Amino acid sequence: MTLVKRVNLEPAFVIHTRAFKETSLLVDLFTKNLGRINVVAKGARRPKSPLRSVLTPASLLAISFSGKSELKNLNACELLNHYSISMPLSFNSIVYVNELLIKATEKEDPHVEIFNQYQSLCEGLSGKKERIEIEVLLRSFELILLQELGYGIDLSFESISGNKIKPKDKYMFDPSLGFNKVQTDSIKSNGIFLGKDILNFSSGDLTEEDSRLASKKIMRLALDYHLGNKSLNIRKYLSKE
């Protein structure tokens, strides 16, 4: 683990806050170059603290902090951009992704591409968005997250034979292996998907409801497998799960 003495103007997003002592906050931050870190924002809960309005979700910050231990001291914080995410589904999506980052990543383990994708997600969720658009953004982020963590999913080829996935064939998805063709008349069984839906997911085309549902199930199976016993609490609050 990297022990940081002092860092200035590091790009970061707030992914979780909680009260600390009488007037301070403990803040989980996802930074561009240092990964996920924890800081103490002293006095941030005071009514006149300038930190109150900037330590919020979907805000791109430039932070300065210091400390050798795992818990750093936040010395300064500048708001670079705030992405207005007001629609309930979009806001819940950010809450979901924030919890996913906490559960899936290790502290002080840098992932620049995940940070960039997170920023793109915030940009994409800002303003009015249709459910389909939001689901495409979420599935894209989940795929990149797993890929960057070393758990990428091949949506084009079978894992054992190496054959191309074909639209009319059916495939069993094993999160530890990938997709492999099966002989069955049903795709209702958990873990079995139609090739067409897998390929649509691969191309980012989720206009068909069956493909959207399949992509969501694939990612849930993969994430649950790699998270192990770290269940995502936000799921029970999301609508139409």
Regions found by a protein language model. Give the residues of each.
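Non-catalytic alpha-helical scaffolds and adjoining flexible linkers that form interface surfaces
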Residues: 1-25, 30-241
